A protein has these predicted regions:
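Buried, small/hydrophobic-residue-enriched core segments of structured protein domains
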Residues: 37-40, 53, 58-67, 76-242
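A structural connector/turn signal
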Residues: 22, 68, 73-74
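Low-complexity, highly charged intrinsically disordered N-terminal segments
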Residues: 1-48
Length: 242
């Protein structure tokens, strides 16, 4: 059971295909786009084999729903790399090309899978050494390890969407993140107000360097004055390690 339900890759279809149905404007635009590319390659004398009848059938017979069955490993499941993650089955032999239309969007699963796998391997390593070097066991290990790998990944990815997807995968394994977009994505999609991850007050380099180096200690004291109880995080390398 993962934090995000049991239906695989739901996020992709809700976000990218709306209500999962095809409307006339969708494939009319696709047809114009394809014809334009066809002409650019100098093949204008040959009719472009656009599957107009197939798309029309999907609209007429299936009310725009795609005759496709998609099966996948439930979210949050740990599987070997040789395991099939997704299968796409066409349920109407008259539109056999439809499966490949979904290939690229389905492959987006590689990114959260990679993030989730990496954070899980790090978590396993942390658990191993917590048990070897501390007196924690059972729930104690579980509670402390949940906050030992914090997600600051927003600045290291290509877009807001990427940050949200990556964070959603990370918080399957850990509860600490500063990537708010990922928490909001998971909350919105799975319709919950539960807080799925957490953070603490923290400084950044600008809030330390603005005090200037001679007053770095004052900057740290100010942090403690502002947050006299609980945990805070302070960057220690703005000038030098104190």
């Amino acid at each position: 059971q993962s934090l995000y339900g049991n239906e695989p890759n739901q996020y992709l279809f809700t976000w990218r295909t709306g209500d999962n149905t095809l409307v006339l404007n969708d494939y009319s635009r696709a047809q114009r786009f394809a014809w334009y590319l066809w002409d650019q390659f100098g093949i204008g004398g040959t009719p472009y084999p656009f599957p107009y009848e197939g798309f029309q059938k999907i609209i007429d017979k299936y009310k725009g729903a795609l005759p496709i069955t998609i099966k996948a490993v439930p979210e949050g499941t740990s599987v070997k790399t040789s395991n099939v993650l997704i299968t796409v089955e066409n349920t109407d032999p008259e539109v056999p090309w439809l499966t490949n239309y979904l290939e690229s969007i389905l492959l987006q699963v590689w990114y959260p899978t990679t993030v989730g796998t990496l954070s899980r391997e790090i978590k396993k390593l942390l658990v191993t050494y917590l048990k070897k070097t501390t007196s924690y066991d059972g729930d104690g290990v579980k509670n402390i390890v949940s906050f030992m790998l914090h997600d600051f990944g927003f600045r290291g990815v290509s877009s807001v969407e990427s940050s949200a997807i990556g964070c959603s995968a990370h918080i399957v394994n850990f509860l600490g993140t500063d990537t708010v977009s990922g928490i909001l994505l998971a909350q919105d999609y799975y319709n919950t107000d539960n807080m799925l991850a957490f953070s603490i007050p923290a400084s950044e380099h600008s809030t330390i360097t603005s005090w200037t180096e001679p007053f770095e200690v004052k900057a740290m004291e100010n942090m403690l004055d502002q947050y006299p109880t609980g945990l805070v995080a302070c960057v220690s390398d703005s000038f030098d390690i104190i």
